[in-house]
Amino acid sequence: MQKYAPLLLFATLALVGTQPAVAQDRGSGVVFVQTNEPSGNKIDVFDRGADGRLTLAGTFPTGGLGGVAAPGSESDHLASQGSLVLSPDGRALIAVNAGSDTVTAFRVHGDRLQLRNVVSSGGEFPASVAVHDDLVYVLNSGGTGIVQGFQLRGDGLVAIPGSARTLGLANGDPPDFLTAPGQVDFTPDGGKLLVTTKASTSSIDVFDVGTDGRLSASPVVNPSATPVPFAFTFGSQGRLVAGEAGTSSVTTYAIGTGGTLSDPKSQSDGQVALCWIHRR
């Protein structure tokens, strides 16, 4: 391809080996890659040259363990999108440690990382992270599926009391690739938190976010237009853009003020098992 497409789509069958989690600091030309090793999770930091070439600048342990979802996850051991996230201001990097049920917060200093703290994820098998301003939510994809809230401070992550919410799932620990929830993220304005449940319920769950950082007691459960909603991003007009693996389709939705998704428009990519999606 000669140009970057607005949406980048990824199918599991096109990949070989483990899919690493990647966060990119475009301003400083630094790329962060999570190794997700069960013996000890680490972040590899690369400097990116003007020609796109990467040079390893350092490796930084997270203080936790990587994890592997149940069989079927050979190309994506965490079965998710968003397991390594750079804060919008580029000053913090947050990584999940699925094998030890913890989350790590780093301070970013160019191509160097300073570990701030390692905290309990509030559930089993943390696999995805969402950040909006100083509010962080972690998706735990094992067990019933717990989303846990944190405040992001200078010294790291601090759990918000009473912020945990369950998705009411019935996964193991580790979860199965197909039934593990795929992603958590905020709407661009931070007013809602969305979770995709993949084949567990084939739904996109939408929570309201209160001014105190806590979520509504239960989400609005929206059936996906096509089966197995995996990952998502947002369009320029605020529409949800979801990758749905069951039919290898991309579907856009309007997000209502009450959390209901409407006006679905789907298009297959002509491939198999579309999983990850990213908008530049």
Question: Model-derived features: where do they sit?
Answer:
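Conserved beta-strand positions in repeat-built beta-propeller and related beta-rich domains
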Residues: 34-37, 87-88, 95-99, 138-143, ...
